[in-house]
Structure formats: structure tokens, C-alpha cells
């Protein structure tokens, strides 16, 4: 059943900037990291990817999804159709999650190409591949909350919420013992053992406590659990009744 809704949602992204972002954002990230520090390229690229570019891309995908629906019919087309609204909401989340995964694959592909273009470039190994998968898993929770914020408060609010949350809150707590209390710190924290870089961008020395892989399982579990909770909670607001209440409040 969900497959039908996912296909329908995916078609809405046809010939849109959202699909182009899957290629554009990873490329911008790679170029930016190369210009910043070509001598420490791999670790720097993944550091910027986890702190800035990945959160911004997820927020943009969510905001653009909302913007497209709002411009098309202000969700009236969906609300007036004989569909299960919670399935539509889950499909929206699923499509953005798949696009996020696709961007990780594209990003990894660009990194593989770089090792053939630049002779001094370090080879891609299993931990680098694991870093991509971990980044995807630990950012899944951002999708339902950014979709909800985009519908509730608008395009800019969703982007600023996720970007500032990662840059400010994520970096602040990622290296602390209480990193697990802050969802934005999860993807940044798991980059420490996988890529060997501190959240502030400094390479970690061998034996540094931050290089311990013990943080990876709880980060993944916490993200998946929070993702499931937020997806279920936010689906309740996806209804014409809630939209009418919002319109009345704005009018008043």
C-alpha cells in the first residue's frame, strides 16, 4: 500500500530542483572542503557534510515539498481525494528519506572519482563508506520535524531551524558526555570514530576518547526511534481540520 503513495509523491518531484539537489549539494560540499583545506580533504569534507550541508539539504527538501503542495492547490487536492492522509504523510517522509540516501550515494561516488583525479588523494575504505550510511541513519529524524515546521511556520523557518540546530547546538554538545541528549549532535559525533575528526574540525589523535566506536550503536538506535516517534506525532497535524484551525488563527 505504501508503495503506491511513495510512487505518487516521487512523481511530484519530477523535473524539480529537489532532484537536482541530490547532485548539486554534495558537489558544493566537496568543492567547499577542497578550497578550505585540500591537505585534509576527506575528513574535512565529511565534517562539513555532517554539520552544514546535510542538515540544510534535508530542510530544503522538506521545505520545497511543502512549497510545491502549497502552490499547486494548498493541499486541497490531497484533502479532497479518497486517500489515507497518514499514508500520504508517511510517503512524503519516505521519498525525502530516499532522496537523502541517494545524496549519500552521489557524495560517495564523487569521493571515489576524486581519488582518480588527484594522485595524492587518500583511497576510499570501508570506514568512509560506513560514514555515509551512518550520516543517513542519524539524520532521518530531521525529516518529519522539518516537514512539520515547513507546513506550520513556512519555508525559511524549516531551513533556519535545522541549520542553526546543527551548527550551534550540534557542535556544542557533540564532544561532551551528554551528546546523546541532543539529536543534532548524533551525526556529528559518529564522524569522530569513523573519519577521525573532532566536531571543531581538528584531526583526532590516536587514543583520543572521541575515536571510540561505542557511541555508534546508541546514536543509530536513538535516531531511528526518534524518527518513528516524530513521524507518528507529526502525521496527526496533516489533516484539513488542522489546516482550517491555522487559517482561522491567522485571520484572527
Go through the PLM ranges and name each one.
Residues 65-98:
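Helix-loop-helix units of permease transmembrane domains in multi-pass membrane transporters
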Residues 58-62, 142-146, 229-230, 234:
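Hydrophobic/aromatic residues in alpha-helical transmembrane segments
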Residues 65-73, 140-168:
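Cytoplasmic juxtamembrane interface segments
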Residues 15-38, 48-61, 158-173, 222, ...:
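Hydrophobic alpha-helical transmembrane segments of multi-pass membrane transport/permease proteins
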Residues 1-23, 240-252:
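Aromatic- and glycine-rich beta-strand/loop motifs that create alpha-glucan
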Residues 40, 164-247:
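Terminal transmembrane helical anchor/hairpin motif
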Residues 26-57, 94-155, 209-214:
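Secretory targeting signals
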Amino acid at each position: 500500500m505504501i508503495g503506491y503513495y511513495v510512487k505518487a509523491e516521487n512523481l511530484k518531484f519530477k523535473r524539480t530542483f529537489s532532484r537536482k539537489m541530490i547532485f548539486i549539494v554534495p558537489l558544493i560540499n566537496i568543492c567547499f572542503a577542497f578550497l578550505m583545506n585540500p591537505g585534509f580533504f576527506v575528513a574535512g569534507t565529511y565534517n562539513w557534510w555532517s554539520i552544514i550541508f546535510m542538515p540544510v539539504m534535508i530542510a530544503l527538501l522538506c521545505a520545497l515539498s511543502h512549497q510545491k503542495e502549497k502552490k499547486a492547490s494548498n493541499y486541497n487536492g490531497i484533502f479532497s481525494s479518497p486517500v489515507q492522509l497518514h499514508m500520504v504523510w508517511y510517503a512524503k517522509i519516505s521519498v525525502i528519506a530516499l532522496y537523502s540516501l541517494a545524496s549519500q550515494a552521489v557524495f560517495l561516488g564523487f569521493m571515489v572519482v576524486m581519488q582518480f583525479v588527484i594522485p595524492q588523494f587518500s583511497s576510499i575504505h570501508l570506514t568512509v563508506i560506513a560514514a555515509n550510511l551512518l550520516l543517513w541513519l542519524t539524520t532521518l529524524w530531521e525529516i518529519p520535524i522539518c516537514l512539520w515546521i515547513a507546513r506550520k511556520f513556512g519555508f525559511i523557518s524549516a531551513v533556519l531551524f535545522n541549520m542553526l540546530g546543527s551548527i550551534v547546538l550540534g557542535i556544542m554538545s557533540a564532544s561532551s558526555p551528554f551528546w546523546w541528549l541532543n539529536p543534532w549532535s548524533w551525526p556529528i559525533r559518529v564522524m569522530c570514530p569513523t573519519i577521525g575528526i573532532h566536531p571543531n574540525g581538528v584531526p583526532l589523535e590516536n587514543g583520543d576518547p572521541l575515536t571510540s566506536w561505542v557511541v555508534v550503536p546508541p546514536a543509530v538506535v536513538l535516531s531511528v526511534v526518534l524518527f518513528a516517534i516524530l513521524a507518528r506525532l507529526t502525521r496527526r497535524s496533516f489533516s484539513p481540520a488542522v489546516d482550517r484551525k491555522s487559517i482561522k488563527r491567522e485571520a484572527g
